[in-house]
């Protein structure tokens, strides 16, 4: 029997699956389908949009499993997630099953509409239910993970992907008013099972990994009593084992860290931070949920960490991780999330949030990422009763706060993290144009506007020239002055760039400096590679 996996992408508090990130779900499902003797083929929603003929082919498939759900919406460069509107036209195969966090937000009316177009909805979390719905009897998610690794070779961007790896599921806190992680029971994968999946993916050609599918990386392998105590020795062995099995990994990063774990267990957390700096790759980010710096909002929404605990976690990660490394980025930095529209929020909340960020700046601490989003209301969460009334009430304050942060915090912070002239390595071009857009394959990579037309999937090293609010503009490193375009020279040197262009070939560094000044030697080479 023929089955299609249609990846409409997911973005959850503890899982990212929008290109270049590949969530565990397609891999689990592929392994599951193989165990049930299906001949499975993987498609991204972007591929189906671009290839109508493939959509026609799907009508001959026996089964389609559609994955979708953006629980924490963001802006995406690498792909456009499946929308609800598109979903109703996804009943393509003989039998169609919908899985993923999108099922948490479907109304009764939408469920009936899906039934009308013959799309079966499987409740989230879905893996065991899907397997049983397809007639399976011996459910083993770890076995499916390793067996399904080979599906990544069918990804349109392979090998330019980063695989999201699940270490455990659920949240030891599980009380935040808005969060969907409460739907998961705590379930832990053994180091051996995680390593087996990483090795299977590595053997398929994957070189970029994010240990991101958990709510708190620091508590993996820890003692789960109260606030989990990290186990730095076990984590060090785990990291060593990854490199022993997969010595040519290019990216090894994490995602979520609960700042409460760090604040409650500072000594163990410090040792784990050192392990991450030593055994993971630079440019790493620990995304932490501050959500609000207003103590009233913290209490009313049962948030995990106080502003003081978050500030402590930011400082501790900075202490060991802020130093720049070989790829141009600091080894390991914190990031923080703000959620707007929570219970108890007032106009003063926005001032408290901003004051928190000002204190970070005053203490000369680095934040790699400040994520500001409006709360998304899910049925079954405490925020369901509250609704979106504060979002509507504080719309102006939200926009003003976001703009203020982008202007006064993000840009100065970016200048500290990536000073002018800093070389950034291994930038993958994702969008080609007069300004080509490129990023490292990493967790929360910085967007780089690369001056010049470069083909998609080319890897380029570049030097920082200028700044946006959350991005930098750069030119190719070691750019040969005699091969550079007029646009590149004018961008670097202004009006003098045209003079340099007209007087080519330039014969020496001294001649280049005489025309363009000392700064020209930072970015341009004479006869450079």
From Swiss-Prot:
Gene3D superfamilies linked to this entry: tm_1862 like domain (3.80.30.20)
Protein residues bound to [4Fe-4S] cluster: 171, 176, 179
Key word Metal-binding present: yes
GO molecular function per UniProt: 4 iron, 4 sulfur cluster binding; catalytic activity; metal ion binding
Lineage per the UniProt record: Archaea, Methanobacteriati, Methanobacteriota, Archaeoglobi, Archaeoglobales
Record's protein name: Uncharacterized protein AF_0243
InterPro entries tied to this protein: Elp3/MiaA/NifB-like_rSAM (IPR006638), rSAM (IPR007197), rSAM_horseshoe (IPR023404)
UniProt xrefs under SUPFAM superfamilies: Radical SAM enzymes
Keywords associated with the record: 4Fe-4S, Iron, Iron-sulfur, Metal-binding, S-adenosyl-L-methionine
Domain Radical SAM core: start-end pairs: 157-410
Keyword Kinase part of the UniProt annotation: no
């Amino acid at each position: 029997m023929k089955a299609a996996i249609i990846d409409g992408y997911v973005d959850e508090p503890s899982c990212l699956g929008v290109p270049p990130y590949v969530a565990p779900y397609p891999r689990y499902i592929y392994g599951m389908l193989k165990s049930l003797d299906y001949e499975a083929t993987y498609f991204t929603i972007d591929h189906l949009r671009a290839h109508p003929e493939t959509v026609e082919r799907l009508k001959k498939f026996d089964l389609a499993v559609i994955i979708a759900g953006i629980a924490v919406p963001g802006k995406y460069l690498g792909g456009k997630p499946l929308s609800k509107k598109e979903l109703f036209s996804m009943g393509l195969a003989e039998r169609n099953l919908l899985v993923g966090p999108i099922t948490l937000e479907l109304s009764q009316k939408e469920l009936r509409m899906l039934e009308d177009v013959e799309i079966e909805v499987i409740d989230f979390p879905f893996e065991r239910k899907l397997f049983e719905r397809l007639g399976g009897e011996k459910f083993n998610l770890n076995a499916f993970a390793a067996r399904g690794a080979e599906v990544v070779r069918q990804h349109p961007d392979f090998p330019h992907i980063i695989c999201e790896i699940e270490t455990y599921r659920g949240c030891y806190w599980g009380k935040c008013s808005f969060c969907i992680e409460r739907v998961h029971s705590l379930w832990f994968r053994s180091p051996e099972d995680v390593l087996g999946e990483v090795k299977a993916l590595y053997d398929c050609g994957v070189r970029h990994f994010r240990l991101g599918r958990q709510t708190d990386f620091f508590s993996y392998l820890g003692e789960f009593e109260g606030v989990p105590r990290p186990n730095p020795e076990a984590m060090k062995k785990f990291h060593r084992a990854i490199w022993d099995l997969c010595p040519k990994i290019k990216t090894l990063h994490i995602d979520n860290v609960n700042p409460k774990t760090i604040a409650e267990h500072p000594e163990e957390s410090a040792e784990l931070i050192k392990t991450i700096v030593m055994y993971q790759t630079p440019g790493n980010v620990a995304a932490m949920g501050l959500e609000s710096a207003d103590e009233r909002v913290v209490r009313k929404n049962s948030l995990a960490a106080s502003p003081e605990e978050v500030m402590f976690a930011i400082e501790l990660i900075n202490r060991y991780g802020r130093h720049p490394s070989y790829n141009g980025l600091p080894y390991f930095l914190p990031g923080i999330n703000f959620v707007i529209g929570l219970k108890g929020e007032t106009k003063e909340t926005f001032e408290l949030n901003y004051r928190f960020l000002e204190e970070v700046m005053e203490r000369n601490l680095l934040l790699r990422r400040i994520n500001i989003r409006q709360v998304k209301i899910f049925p079954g969460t405490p925020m369901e009763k509250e609704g979106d009334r504060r979002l509507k009430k504080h719309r102006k304050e939200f926009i003003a706060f976001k703009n203020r942060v982008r202007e006064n915090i993000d840009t100065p912070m970016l200048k500290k993290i990536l000073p002018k002239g800093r070389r950034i390595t291994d930038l993958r071009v994702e969008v080609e144009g007069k300004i080509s857009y490129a990023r490292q394959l990493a967790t929360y990579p910085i967007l780089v506007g690369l001056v010049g037309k470069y083909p998609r999937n080319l890897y380029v090293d570049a030097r920082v020239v200028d700044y946006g609010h959350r991005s930098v503009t750069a030119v190719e490193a070691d750019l040969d002055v005699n091969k550079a375009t007029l646009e590149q020279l004018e961008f670097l040197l202004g009006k003098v760039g045209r003079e340099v262009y007209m007087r080519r070939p330039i014969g020496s560094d001294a001649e280049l400096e005489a025309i363009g000044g000392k700064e020209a030697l930072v970015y341009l080479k004479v006869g450079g590679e």
